[in-house]
């Protein structure tokens, strides 16, 4: 009986993934060729960043989990970093990190992921869209050097954010215990 329930859950999970994929494919069919090529470059660029900086991103992700940082804290730090530096390479590195979070959180946490990738962040990333498109259309060799610099910047920003948020919660806890 238990085995049948496990199979039911597996099929249920797979059907949900299938339907989500079909919906996404339907949205992709509505794109023109130019939009499809840009989307393809975004995919490739983000995958390149995630693959080459997997250890750094995983370390940043683990810090988020260890410190139990809320989605609103993550979102506010991402917005803050995009306000400080709005270069297309920073935007792409940020998007790559968000996509890594989405992969790790999976379907169960879709609403949490969408809280992070709010309209405000989408607006910040898509602002100056021509520069963003020009950046992802460059040759891969030109982009590599920018990714190294940007990933280091993003790593410092996220770790700084984590330290700041952790310090905030520690101070809050200490003040509560004192008073």
Swiss-Prot record:
It comes from the Viruses. The chain crosses the membrane at residues 148-170. Interacts with host BAX and BAK1. Pfam families: M11L. The keyword Transmembrane applies. Plays a role in the inhibition of host apoptosis by sequestering and inactivating several proapoptotic BCL-2 proteins, including BAK1 and BAX. Prevents the conformational activation of both of them. It comes from Deerpox virus (strain Mule deer/United States/W-848-83/1983). InterPro entries: Bcl-2-like_sf, Poxvirus_F1/C10. The lineage of its organism: Viruses, Varidnaviria, Bamfordvirae, Nucleocytoviricota, Pokkesviricetes. GO terms for cellular component: host cell membrane; host cell mitochondrion; membrane. Its main location: host cell. One of its GO terms (biological process) is regulation of apoptotic process. It is found in: Host mitochondrion; Host membrane. It is a single-pass membrane protein. The keyword Electron transport does not apply. Keywords: Host membrane, Host mitochondrion, Host-virus interaction, Inhibition of host apoptosis by viral BCL2-like protein, Membrane, Modulation of host cell apoptosis by virus, Transmembrane, Transmembrane helix. This is Apoptosis regulator DPV022.
């Amino acid at each position: 009986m238990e085995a049948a329930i496990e199979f039911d859950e597996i099929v249920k999970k797979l059907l949900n993934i299938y339907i989500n994929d079909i919906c996404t494919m339907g949205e992709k069919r509505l794109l023109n060729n130019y939009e499809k090529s840009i989307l393809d470059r975004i995919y490739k660029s983000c995958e390149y960043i995630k693959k080459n900086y997997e250890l750094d991103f995983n370390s940043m992700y683990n810090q988020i989990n260890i410190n139990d940082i809320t989605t609103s804290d993550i979102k506010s730090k991402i917005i803050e970093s995009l306000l400080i530096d709005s270069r297309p390479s920073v935007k792409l590195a940020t998007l790559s990190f968000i996509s890594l979070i989405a992969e790790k959180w999976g379907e169960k946490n879709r609403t949490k992921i969408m809280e992070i990738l709010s309209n405000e962040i989408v607006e910040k990333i898509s602002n100056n869209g021509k520069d963003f498109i020009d950046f992802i259309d460059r040759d891969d060799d030109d982009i590599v050097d920018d990714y190294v610099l940007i990933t280091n910047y993003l790593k410092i920003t996220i770790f700084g954010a984590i330290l700041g948020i952790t310090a905030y919660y520690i101070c809050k806890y200490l003040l509560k215990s004192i008073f």
